[in-house]
Amino acid sequence: EEKFPLFGNLVPRDVASREIHDIVYNQKLGISGEPMVYLDLTHKSKDYLEDRLGGIIDIYQKFTGEDPKDIPMKIFPAVHYSMGGLWTDYEADGNGMIKHGSPRNQATSIPGLYAGGEADYQYHGANRLGANSLLSCIYTGLMMCRGIFTHVDNLDKSVDDIPSTTFGDAKSFWENRFKEIRGMKGKENPYQLHRDLGDIMMGNVLIVRENKKLEQTIQKIDNIKTRFKDINCVDTTDWANPTPSFINQLYCMIELSRVIT
């Protein structure tokens, strides 16, 4: 409110997020050196907070064990939406309008793979508008479903025609992949590597992006990719063990992080 008096406490969330980012990463004033700042609601009455933010207050209290009515909240912008998406096609009729029922509608460049809603690219700009995700989900969902039925009806083969060896080969691939992961006996902790990657991306490729920092980030991601080869699979048991799957996902995260950067 001091920096943007015309907005009062109604400053847009993207502006507020950039200010929090500046406090944490440029001014180095995050709480205890961590990426978080205080949101003080203690001056508001408990009835007011329960009425306006009841659900959020309850969730925060369960996760932190602290009551925002008495102790300032610790907050930081969270990633919950990825701008951009898969390229998708469409077919126009003679009037230039969408030809409903066409198998090309919302089809990606991979035959048989369709994308709609937040997974495709068409409704994204420099900043996300809250209702656009719902709009795109409804519109592309309605348009895509009829096209999928048309695509399936026009297929020459069904899943029953696929050789069983195809599934056997896929199963063998993943069995060998996880066997390889379980055999990783290096020095790097995968969970620490994941944290390091997250810190780099949050600091340089989240809210504020600068070319120089992006170039530095690519170098750091390449370094993490090198460190990945020296991972230690800290749990090699077969039953109810999420570690090998996490390590496999971490590899994909590293690749995706570089693409995004």
Enumerate the language-model features and the residues they cover.
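Accessory "access/gating" subregions that flank catalytic or transport cores
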Residues: 47-108
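Secondary-structure capping and boundary motifs in well-ordered enzyme cores
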Residues: 80, 102-112, 133-140, 189, ...
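A conserved FAD-binding loop/helix module that cradles the flavin
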Residues: 122-148
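Long, amphipathic alpha-helical stalk/connector segments used for oligomerization, subunit docking
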Residues: 151-239
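C-terminal amphipathic alpha-helical interaction region
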Residues: 227-260
